[in-house]
Design a protein with these regions (language model features):
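Well-ordered alpha-helical segments embedded in enzymatic catalytic cores
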Residues: 25-29, 46-47
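Conserved interdomain linker/interface between the two RecA-like ATPase lobes of SF2 helicase motors
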Residues: 1-2
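Conserved two-lobed SF2 helicase motor
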Residues: 33-49, 61
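Beta-edge loop/turn motif
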Residues: 11, 42-48, 52-56, 178-183
Length: 271
């Protein structure tokens, strides 16, 4: 989608494959253009729904669950400076070649049902209650596949909660992700060099955080075998810290990109 629109004036892309420092710079530019009334079209993944403080007159969101739609709507007229009739949130169905995952398809189906019932007040408490009630009914025991709630319930009378077992079983995202440090600018390169010679991590980890992206563990292994990343100070810290070698795989528009890396299998690239 971005590739088809990038020739237009004021088109930007936001993704979790950009390090936080990169995203911050992009957002600063985006906010400036919005403030000045300049053309501004942002094509983003769902990361923009996670509390990003931007205010658009129009938001277009691919079909998803009502909670995701509500989060996307929060980027429209966020500052309340426009009249409601001048603020628009459009929900669209992607074309067939961009078929959504089965999980998202179910949530979208429930959302459409709620739209039919609450078309005039989609973000009301009643609409949101109806949405989650139907989702819970359809998903049933699938919501607690690891029986965490059952363990909590069984331990309730004795207060002997198996916290360690619950912590081991609970995982919001099943895919194992690993941080990769991006030598995005001179500051990042200096921090990486400091890490090479550090005996203790100290405050370096916090300073490096804005320069990391999260990638699947399998992709990290493939990148390492291909010589595109390196372990930093492995003697001291083991296999904790990896850095991208150069910026050939990091695009100034789209962030970390591996489109030309044929050795990475498709299933390793799902983010």
């Amino acid at each position: 989608l971005y590739d088809s629109a990038k020739q237009l004036d004021g088109v930007f892309h936001l993704t979790t494959l950009m390090c936080a420092k990169h995203r911050s710079q992009m957002l600063e530019t985006i906010r400036g253009r919005l403030k000045n009334g300049e053309p501004c079209l942002v094509i983003a993944t769902s990361l923009i729904e996670a509390g990003v403080d931007v205010d658009f007159p129009l938001v277009m969101r691919a079909e998803a669950g009502l909670d995701s739609v509500a989060q996307a709507a929060g980027r429209c007229n966020r500052e309340g400076k426009r009249l409601p009739e001048e603020s628009f949130v459009w929900i669209f169905q992607p074309e067939a070649q961009w078929k959504a995952p089965a999980e998202l398809g179910l949530l979208s189906s429930v959302m459409r049902s709620v739209v039919r019932q609450h078309a005039g007040n989609l973000l009301s408490a009643e609409a949101i209650t109806d949405y989650f009630s139907e989702v819970y009914q359809l998903k049933g025991v699938e919501l607690d596949q690891r029986r965490i709630l059952a363990m909590h319930h069984n331990a309730g009378s004795s207060l002997n909660f198996p916290f360690q077992t619950i912590a081991a079983k609970f995982r919001m995202i099943e895919t194992h992700m690993q941080p990769l440090i991006i030598p995005f600018d001179d500051d990042a390169e200096r921090l990486i060099e400091s890490l090479r010679h550090a005996d203790q991590i100290g405050g370096l980890l916090r300073k490096l955080q804005p320069y990391t992206v999260q990638i699947p563990e399998s992709a990290l292994d493939a990148l390492l075998k291909a010589g595109r990343i390196e372990a930093i100070n492995e003697h001291t810290f083991g296999k904790q810290f990896y850095s991208l070698i150069g910026l050939d795989l990091y695009d100034e528009v789209a962030g970390f990109s591996w489109e030309d890396m044929a050795f990475l299998k498709g299933e390793s690239l799902v983010l």
